[in-house]
Amino acid sequence: KVAIIGGGLSGLVLARNLDDSSKVTVFEKSSGVAGRMATRLVEPFEFDHGAQFFTARSEAFKNFLLPYLEKETVVAWNPKVVTLEEGKKPYKRPWFETHYIAQPRMTSLVKALGAPVDIRLNTKIDEVFKQDNSWSLKSAGKTIGEGFDWLISSAPGNQAFEIFNKSGITLKGLDEVEYSPCFALMVGLYSELSLGFDAAVVKNSPIKWIAANSTKYGRRKEKALVIHSCNKWAFEQMNEELPHVQSLLENELFKLTDVSAKDVSCIDMARWRYAKVERE
């Protein structure tokens, strides 16, 4: 028996690889799987507010993707990409390798992986302990799984450290993993607005990325924008209230594009504390 903490891509890939030889249970603290490959629905809009795309560089990962490419759960994304900078003319930014997305939303790949797996949602593991050569897990002070031969965490290093440290287990180096954060601003527009790009890399701004989510293959037609902040800027703003950060990013978006406040139908925010690994 194997227990895996975390229902993101890495946790569910591992679960599927072990599924033939072991009885696997995945424990996920959120209401759905996907982790940083998340999609948020704010009717009638949808936003891939986590990972925007992924690349495949190793032969192992390319082979892993083949069945999902055949089923079109994963497709190549070929957007018109530009570089934006306030006060300067945008210029085209070519991509020199294939970029992939899951469809009809980024969660689709992880959900396909997790379909045959025993997944316990809304289950935040806060303590683990070993007794008689088997592992047990606690959530909200109650034992919710026991008798596991192996325990594996795919959670961010800081979260895994908290779980194991509380349990009196020291894993060398786990508390030394460093992450940088990111804010995601999600903007739904009343109607079609010509931005002149499908995606933009932004320079010298609190914003580093803008994507017209609705231009991705298989997405809803409602015009939806996903804006990611710079990691360094996000770190500096990490303890600010979300409405304040939202206002700053919103104003920056208006400066960089033809979007204005009157175009905005809905707006939402997300705070990614563990967006990017800086040091392992």
PLM feature spans:
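Short beta-strand to alpha-helix junction loop
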Residues: F53-E59, K88-A112, N239-L248
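A conserved short coil-to-beta-strand element within the FAD-binding core of flavoproteins
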Residues: L121-W135
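Active-site substrate-recognition segment that forms the wall
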Residues: M186-M238, P243-D258
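Flavin (FAD/FMN) cofactor-binding core of flavoprotein oxidoreductases
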Residues: S247-L248, F254-E280
